[in-house]
Amino acid sequence: MSHHSQIQKIQAREIMDSRGNPTVEVDVILLDGSFGRAAVPSGASTGEYEAVELRDGDKHRYLGKGVLKAVEHVNLKIQEVLKGENAIDQNRIDQLMLDADGTKNKGKLGANAILGTSLAVAKAAAAHSKLPLYRYIGGNFARELPVPMMNIINGGAHADNNVDFQEFMILPVGAKSFREALRMGAEIFHSLKSVLKGKKLNTAVGDEGGFAPDLTSNVEAIEVILQAIEKAGYKPEKDVLLGLDAASSEFYDKSKKKYVLGAENNKEFSSAELVDYYANLVSKYPIITIEDGLDENDWDGWKLLSEKLGKKIQLVGDDLFVTNIEKLSKGISSGVGNSILIKVNQIGSLSETLSSIEMAKKAKYTNVVSHRSGETEDVTISHIAVATNAGQIKTGSLSRTDRIAKYNELLRIEEELGKSAVYKGRETFYNL
């Protein structure tokens, strides 16, 4: 190895995320001065099988949410293990950290410590190789810009309103380029604002930049979005498709084994009834994707959903798979879902994230690279989406710099790729 790509210094610090909570940022410097920096996101609705985000628990600092322990793990333990190692060997770097941690869920050093370092090492190695990150990770075949899943209305755990589902998204599949898709999304977002104003509804934005108006039902959320699409001069179905993130674990009553929909007068649904509820929505509206339609432990319900809708629409497992290879392979062998949400901090290292994406592709599952509700200005996920030709990205609405930063980076990448850039639009859903 050229010793120039040896890791010389690793420095972590506590910074702020988009919700005013502390998070971990890591700098990595190689022997030749190559530099990489990464900041770690965090989620609001967290799956019970996710890698552990280490928080200090000291109530006198940041309400217990400080990350000084994780920072210290990077500066001492991780630095000690990685100093002098070759930054180009990502798999080895990640494995050394996993071995030093020694737990299944990264609970000892913290997934936030490990991930921050993992991504910063990759960025330093890319700088050393004089390549943009997407090219360094993905090689010469990395050229597909993702279809954005833009979360423009929030409900559920992300909002204080009478809407059960956590996210209502638009997917500009009729665009010819990412640049055009972004413009369509922005125009629809502004149209939606005026539709909501016209109905005297709140237009303040939530954690991910979407609106959280006090709508009366799930269907009303869909209807106002369709109005906004048309008002912006686009055609639902032809130009723009819809997506839902039900995040149904949040309205699942474990003791009753029922799904309780507040927007339907607190009616209780069995798994089969909820599947029928979705099927009815899909037959009425141009919905192409539903995420976390059933609780993460309701495998029978998931099987039913997959049998009923799996050939028609994309069924994304988020809490179901938590970007975890073991959970995903169980899903694949049981014929559950047909798509996986990829959140780097759910698994906690770059190489494991890439393995999950690879496994999903081999099984003809689509990949959706995703942000978290607590974000920073870090744009690594834009590069991961292009590097892996994932085809889809979920990184919020059309406001708030923590979201827009990702879109802006994709604009730059598309420009840099020039004529070789691909935007597949509707064909992204190749497995339907």
UniProtKB/Swiss-Prot annotation:
It is found in: Cytoplasm; Secreted; Cell surface. Coiled coil: none annotated. The keyword Secreted applies. (2R)-2-phosphoglycerate binds at residues 166, 343, 372-373, 394. It comes from Leptospira interrogans serogroup Icterohaemorrhagiae serovar Lai (strain 56601). HAMAP family: Enolase. The keyword Metal-binding applies. PROSITE patterns: ENOLASE. GO terms for molecular function: magnesium ion binding; phosphopyruvate hydratase activity. It catalyses: (2R)-2-phosphoglycerate = phosphoenolpyruvate + H2O. Its EC number is 4.2.1.11. The active site is at residues 208, 343. The lineage of its organism: Bacteria, Pseudomonadati, Spirochaetota, Spirochaetia, Leptospirales. This is Enolase. Its cofactor is Mg(2+). GO terms for cellular component: cell surface; extracellular region; phosphopyruvate hydratase complex. Keywords: Cytoplasm, Glycolysis, Lyase, Magnesium, Metal-binding, Secreted. Belongs to the enolase family.
